[in-house]
C-alpha cells in the first residue's frame, strides 16, 4: 500500500454528504437573527433570550401558558365563519377560510377560554394572527361577546390579547358592525363593575385597535408591539408629513399616554394576576402584591430669610 493510500483510508475521509435536520428544530430570531433552539424558545414563551425580542405567539399556546394548568375550558369552539356574501376578490372567501383553517389549525381568528389565573376565576381570549391576519369578522365578534357574557355570568374579569390587522374586508359591513357590537358588550361589563384588561401585542391595527383593544380599564402593551389604526406609509401620504420614528410602537404610546404600561411576556401572568386581585378585591396566596409607586418628595419652599 502506497503512502497516499494509507492517508486516504475510509476512516480519514470526512463525508461531504449533508446531514438532514428535522424541520422546526431551529428558529432564527426576526430581530437579532440569532439561531435559537426552538424548544428553548418555547420554554421562554417565544421571547428571544439573546435580545429579548417578543416574537408572535400562537393564540392557543398563549392562553394555555397564561391560564392555570387543568383549569382551561374553551368556549364557543363550534362557531365557524360562513361566506354569506359569496365574496370574491382574487380568490373566493370560502377558499380563503379553508386555507386559513388548514394552515392555522383553528376555526377562526379568536379563541376564548375560561379558567383561573393564580387561582382567581377569569375569562381570557386571544387573537390568532395566522388566521387571515387575525381579522375580525362576525364569528370573532360573536365569540368576543360570548366571552363578555361568560365574565358577566361568572362575575369575573375579562382579559383579551389582541393581534389583528383589523376588520375582515371579505365580510364588508358585517365585519365593521363587530366594532360597535364588541364595544357595546364591554359597556355592559363596565356597568357591572367588572374589569377588562386589554393586552396589545404585535401587531394590533385597524378596526380592532379602534374598538375593543383600546377599551380596557387597563391597556397593556408588549415590548416594541406595533399598535395603531392605519400604517405609517398611509398616514404620511395622507398628511404629507414625515412622522417620528417608531411612533406606532408601544414605547412611544406609553410615553404619550395611549397605553398604561408595558409588560414583558414572561411577567404577564403575575402582573395581570396582581391587577385582577386589586381590581376585584380577591385574595390569593399565589398573587404577589403590587407595590405602589413612590412619589418623589418635593423640596421645601425657601423662606425669604433663607434666600
From Swiss-Prot:
EC number annotated for this UniProt entry: 2.1.3.15
Source taxon at top rank: Bacteria
Co-factor note (free text): Binds 1 zinc ion per subunit.
Q: Which GO terms describe its molecular function?
A: acetyl-CoA carboxylase activity; ATP binding; carboxyl- or carbamoyltransferase activity; zinc ion binding
What subcellular compartments does it reside in? Cytoplasm
Cofactor(s) this protein cannot do without: Zn(2+)
Instruction: Give all residue intervals belonging to the CoA carboxyltransferase N-terminal domain.
Output: 25-294
The residues that the entry says bind Zn(2+) are: 29, 32, 48, 51
Please provide the Gene Ontology terms (biological process) for this protein.
fatty acid biosynthetic process; malonyl-CoA biosynthetic process
Q: Which InterPro entries match?
A: AcCoA_carboxyl_beta, Acetyl_CoA_COase_Trfase_b_su, ClpP/crotonase-like_dom_sf, COA_CT_N, Znf-ACC
The subunit structure is:
Acetyl-CoA carboxylase is a heterohexamer composed of biotin carboxyl carrier protein (AccB), biotin carboxylase (AccC) and two subunits each of ACCase subunit alpha (AccA) and ACCase subunit beta (AccD).
By sequence similarity, the record places it as follows: Belongs to the AccD/PCCB family.
Task performed by this protein: Component of the acetyl coenzyme A carboxylase (ACC) complex. Biotin carboxylase (BC) catalyzes the carboxylation of biotin on its carrier protein (BCCP) and then the CO(2) group is transferred by the transcarboxylase to acetyl-CoA to form malonyl-CoA.
Indicate what this protein is called per its UniProt record: Acetyl-coenzyme A carboxylase carboxyl transferase subunit beta
State the organism's lineage. Bacteria, Pseudomonadati, Pseudomonadota, Gammaproteobacteria, Vibrionales
Gene transcribed to yield this protein: accD
Amino acid at each position: 500500500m502506497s503512502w497516499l493510500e494509507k492517508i486516504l483510508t475510509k476512516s480519514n475521509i470526512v463525508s461531504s454528504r449533508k446531514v438532514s435536520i428535522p424541520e422546526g428544530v431551529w428558529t432564527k430570531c426576526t430581530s437579532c437573527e440569532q439561531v435559537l433552539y426552538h424548544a428553548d424558545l418555547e420554554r421562554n414563551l417565544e421571547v428571544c433570550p439573546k435580545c429579548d425580542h417578543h416574537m408572535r405567539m400562537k393564540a392557543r399556546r398563549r392562553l394555555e401558558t397564561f391560564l392555570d394548568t387543568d383549569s382551561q375550558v374553551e368556549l364557543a369552539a363550534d362557531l365557524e365563519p360562513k361566506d354569506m356574501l359569496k365574496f370574491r376578490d382574487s380568490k373566493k372567501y370560502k377558499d380563503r377560510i379553508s386555507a386559513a383553517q388548514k394552515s392555522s389549525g383553528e376555526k377562526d381568528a379568536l379563541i376564548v377560554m375560561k379558567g383561573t389565573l393564580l387561582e382567581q376565576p377569569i375569562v381570557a381570549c386571544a387573537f390568532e394572527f395566522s388566521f387571515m391576519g387575525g381579522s375580525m369578522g362576525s364569528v370573532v365578534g360573536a365569540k368576543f361577546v360570548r366571552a363578555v357574557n361568560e365574565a358577566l355570568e361568572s362575575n369575573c374579569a375579562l382579559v383579551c390579547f389582541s393581534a389583528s390587522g383589523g376588520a375582515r374586508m371579505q365580510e364588508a359591513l358585517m365585519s365593521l358592525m363587530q366594532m360597535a357590537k364588541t364595544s357595546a358588550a364591554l359597556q355592559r361589563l363596565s356597568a357591572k363593575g367588572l374589569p377588562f384588561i386589554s393586552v396589545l401585542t404585535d401587531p394590533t391595527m385597524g378596526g380592532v385597535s379602534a374598538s375593543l383593544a383600546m377599551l380596557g380599564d387597563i391597556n397593556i402593551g408588549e415590548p416594541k408591539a406595533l399598535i395603531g389604526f392605519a400604517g405609517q406609509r398611509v398616514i404620511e401620504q395622507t398628511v404629507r408629513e414625515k412622522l417620528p420614528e417608531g411612533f406606532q410602537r408601544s414605547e412611544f404610546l406609553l410615553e404619550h399616554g395611549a397605553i398604561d404600561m408595558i409588560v414583558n411576556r414572561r411577567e404577564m401572568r403575575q402582573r395581570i394576576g396582581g391587577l385582577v386581585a386589586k381590581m376585584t378585591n380577591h385574595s390569593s396566596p399565589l398573587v404577589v402584591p403590587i407595590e405602589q409607586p413612590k412619589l418623589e418628595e418635593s423640596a421645601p419652599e425657601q423662606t425669604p430669610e433663607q434666600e
